[in-house]
Amino acid sequence: MELNVTTKDNSSTIFSFIAVSIPVLLGIFVFMVPFPHTTTIKEICFYLSVSLVVVLFLARKIKLSFQTPLAIPGLLFVAWCFFGLFYAVNPANSIHDFYSHLVKYIILYFIVVNFFSSIRKLSILSWIIICSATILFVWRLYDFYVILGNPLATRFGACVTEVPTNLIGIIAVISIIFSITNIFQAKDWLRKIIFLSVLLPAFAVIFLTQTRGALLALFMALVSLLSGRIKILVGILLLVGGILLVSPAGERFTNDVTENVRIKQGLLVWEVVKDYPITGIGFGMQTFAGNLDLQSYNEKLSEKFRRQEILLNPHNMYTDITVRTGVPGIILFLGVMFSFFRMMWRLKQNGTNGSIASWATAVFAAGIPFFVIGFFDPVFSHYPESILCVVFAMGTVLWRIHEENKSSMKV
């Protein structure tokens, strides 16, 4: 995005300052995402960014672009969610969450796409994510194992509310992916060592939380990222496998999955879906626990599952979307997912230069943890939504650079 300033006077200086301020504010927002008691700072950064974009747009100093391969599937999903508001069980909660957990992040997505419009800016954005995650990991690990005195065999938990234990693996895997990418791209040893050092707390968090979803997401993301560097991939996987063999995390894969309460919850959610198959119960996240008679749905299950605990949310991203937006809603959401990964796959294979292909590989891998961990846990909260929004935006920026390069080659 280029600022449309033709004269150098006081007003042009002000507009230039505003344009520079927007990515700074967004950078602060992204950095603060996982930290507690920073809601005010994040809200100020977000709404101030939106206001400044509006000022520049109304003054005709910028031309916003909304071109993206995600536009059509995304618009269809948003339109269906909006349509479902008219049939929501709890309209107030659904309207609130429709804005807070969907529209707001679409706005954030397009601002990031328009103001982080170069490979250099994407690199800086990845540094912000890595730095924020590393500080969070070191702080929480130190607090849990040193200050509180828990032994290392104790499952890492008691995380801040913005980052529950089961979801911290999302940012940990993304931090690892971006750190490895920056190691490959760094030209000096100092930078390589810095990015190498931040891998330790990220890996520690994944193993100490002992969550199957995070471990599976790590495996799949590493395979995706390093498929072209087989020796490095094999070395890392052997190291990860060795740690699993001697750590309590390995025992998580030997537990009897048939006793997992998530199976019962999936069956219970299916009973709800059968009553609301088209538009779902509404987009509101509190509707499932607050407005449905879950005990009556529990009575429809077999005796084995009736005895198990009733969870207050679907505990799975895909069943969560299905119960809130109906069967058409989950189909449209899967369409958004497919469009994102197809876009990244094409850039991996046919990027107009090595930087685009390299970053497309990283962003493809960075999208994996959200959708893998989503099989095991409810991931729709502001922290993972913000990260997913940024990852989608990074992918779109790469697509735009690729398209611009193709156009310039034809001239």
Predicted regions and their residues:
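Alpha-helical transmembrane segments of multi-pass inner-membrane proteins
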Residues: 29, 50, 78, 82, ...
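Transmembrane signal-anchor helices characteristic of membrane glycosylation enzymes that use polyprenol
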Residues: 32-35, 242-251
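Hydrophobic transmembrane alpha-helices and their immediate junctions
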Residues: 325-368
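Extracytoplasmic loop-helix module adjacent to an early transmembrane segment
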Residues: 48-52, 262-276
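Long extracytoplasmic/lumenal interhelical loops at the membrane interface
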Residues: 254-267, 282-325, 347
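Interfacial transmembrane-helix termini
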Residues: 30-49, 63-70, 79-105, 114-124, ...
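Transmembrane signal-anchor hairpin modules in multi-pass inner-membrane enzymes, especially those
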Residues: 1-93, 117-123, 127, 182-193, ...
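Transmembrane alpha-helices of multi-pass inner-membrane enzymes
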Residues: 47-54, 231-232, 363-411
